[in-house]
């Protein structure tokens, strides 16, 4: 029987297993202990707890192995930790940790801190990806290929230009992620179950002790609100959705019918019956898991949407989807960074296809217009020439000399890639 419900009675193993979050709480185990240390330390600071009692509790918290707390039959890790402290120190010492706290504000704090740790890991992986993209873009600045619209050969670009497009996505994501991260840096501690606590805690000092930058002022919203989780999940899921488009491109280009990329051997597998196959399995998994993240976000937002602003156990079920989204992103971005660092692009094939499939036609029409022919007339004349096999098109290298910021002009690609590489530490790529 769980510790808190022992006074109610009615032990039920089925119900205990069904409602307990103890297995999922592995994601926040260290943060729960950290939050408890801050709580006890502050109670001693304001004189609500004798220093010698607080010292014993903090010393015990320094010793506890958070993973051990996950092995018992408890509702959650908060209950397990309090029971462990009481068993170790006695009720006259351990029994004080329940003062001026609720599982509601403490779990909200632990989730925020654990999420921030994962966001840090994701940011590091994203920066590794950015550095890889910039380095390879510089290497392939002059390597032509057709771009694709409607999955048809379109305007000629370079592989370096394509990689910088992916990098710009990652840069935008990091900007959005930072805004969502700021929400998670606000502390709910001291909010209690909903309306605050009678013990005169200094919530700003408590936030400082726990490692937060600010506080969520309204106590009801602090303990029951989950907008920070929705914001993080939304930012990361949106990024994965957009990133999966590039992942899909790489998978297509690995097909020998296109043959634009040679995937690193460690990223491919073969068939059990067709030994010629080189299946880009890492990116296939990343593509699938990006779609899974969409499902997790739908589940997270769906659960939160049906719960009043105060805490309900529904929110316990929502949190696991946040961890799934963040874990999918961290692992996936690390895999993609490794892929980009090692990929080889077939510049000869890219140039040949750009020439074969008229990827310089728009530049040719535009060039004629700049020489005095109305653009639509130049367009139709060129269309007729292409249909008749008589078109005199700009060469690939001529077409790439577009004088606009951010274009596929190799000089523009080199400047942009060099500027972005300057943000990278040498060990990052």
Curated annotation (Swiss-Prot):
The keyword Repressor does not apply. Gene3D superfamilies: Fumarase/aspartase (C-terminal domain) (1.10.40.30), Fumarase/aspartase (Central domain) (1.20.200.10), Fumarase/aspartase (N-terminal domain) (1.10.275.10). It comes from the Archaea. It is found in: Cytoplasm. One of its GO terms (molecular function) is argininosuccinate lyase activity. Its EC number is 4.3.2.1. Coiled coil: none annotated. Pathway: Amino-acid biosynthesis; L-arginine biosynthesis; L-arginine from L-ornithine and carbamoyl phosphate: step 3/3. Its main location: cytoplasm. It catalyses: 2-(N(omega)-L-arginino)succinate = fumarate + L-arginine. GO terms for biological process: arginine biosynthetic process via ornithine; L-arginine biosynthetic process. InterPro entries: Argininosuccinate_lyase (IPR009049), Fumarase/histidase_N (IPR024083), Fumarate_lyase_fam (IPR000362), Fumarate_lyase_N (IPR022761), L-Aspartase-like (IPR008948). GO terms for cellular component: cytosol. Keywords: Amino-acid biosynthesis, Arginine biosynthesis, Cytoplasm, Lyase. HAMAP family: Arg_succ_lyase. Belongs to the lyase 1 family. Argininosuccinate lyase subfamily. This is Argininosuccinate lyase. The lineage of its organism: Archaea, Thermoproteota, Thermoprotei, Thermoproteales, Thermoproteaceae. The gene is argH.
């Amino acid at each position: 029987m769980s510790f808190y419900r022992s006074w109610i009675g009615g032990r039920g193993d089925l119900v205990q297993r069904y409602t307990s979050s103890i297995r999922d709480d592995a994601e926040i185990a260290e943060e729960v202990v950290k939050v408890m240390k801050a709580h006890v330390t502050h109670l001693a600071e304001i004189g609500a707890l004798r220093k010698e009692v607080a010292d014993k509790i903090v010393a015990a918290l320094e010793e506890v192995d958070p993973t051990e707390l996950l092995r018992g039959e408890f509702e959650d890790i908060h209950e397990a930790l309090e029971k462990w402290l009481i068993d170790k120190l006695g009720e006259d010492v351990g029994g004080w940790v329940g003062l001026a706290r609720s599982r509601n504000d403490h779990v909200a704090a632990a989730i925020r801190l654990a999420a921030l740790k994962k966001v840090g890991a994701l940011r590091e992986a994203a920066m590794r990806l950015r550095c890889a993209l910039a380095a390879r873009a510089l290497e392939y600045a002059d390597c032509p290929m057709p771009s694709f619209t409607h999955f048809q050969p379109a305007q000629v670009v370079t592989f370096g230009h394509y990689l910088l497009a992916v990098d710009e996505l990652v840069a935008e994501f990091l900007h959005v992620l930072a805004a969502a991260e700021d929400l998670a840096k606000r502390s709910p501690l001291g909010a209690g179950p909903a309306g605050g606590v009678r013990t005169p805690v200094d919530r700003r000092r408590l936030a400082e002790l726990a490692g937060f930058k600010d506080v969520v002022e309204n106590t009801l919203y602090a303990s029951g609100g989950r907008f920070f989780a929705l914001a993080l999940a939304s930012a990361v899921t949106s990024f994965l959705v957009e990133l999966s488009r590039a992942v899909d491109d790489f998978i297509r280009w690995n097909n020998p019918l296109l043959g634009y990329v040679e995937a690193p051997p460690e990223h491919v597998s073969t068939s059990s019956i067709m030994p010629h196959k080189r299946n880009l399995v890492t990116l296939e998994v990343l593509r699938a898991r990006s779609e899974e993240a969409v499902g997790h976000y739908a589940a997270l937002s769906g659960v939160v949407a049906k719960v009043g602003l105060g805490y309900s156990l529904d929110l316990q079920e929502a949190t696991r989807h946040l961890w799934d989204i963040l874990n999918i992103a961290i692992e996936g971005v690390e895999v993609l960074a490794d892929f980009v660092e090692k990929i080889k692009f077939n510049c000869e094939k890219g140039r040949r296809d750009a020439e074969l499939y008229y990827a310089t036609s728009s530049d040719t029409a535009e060039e004629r217009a700049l020489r005095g022919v109305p653009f639509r007339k130049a367009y139709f004349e060129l269309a007729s020439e292409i249909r008749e096999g008589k078109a005199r098109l700009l060469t690939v290298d001529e077409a790439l000399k577009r004088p606009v910021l951010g274009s596929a002009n190799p000089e523009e690609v080199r400047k942009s890639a060099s500027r972005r590489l300057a943000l990278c530490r040498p060990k990052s790529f």
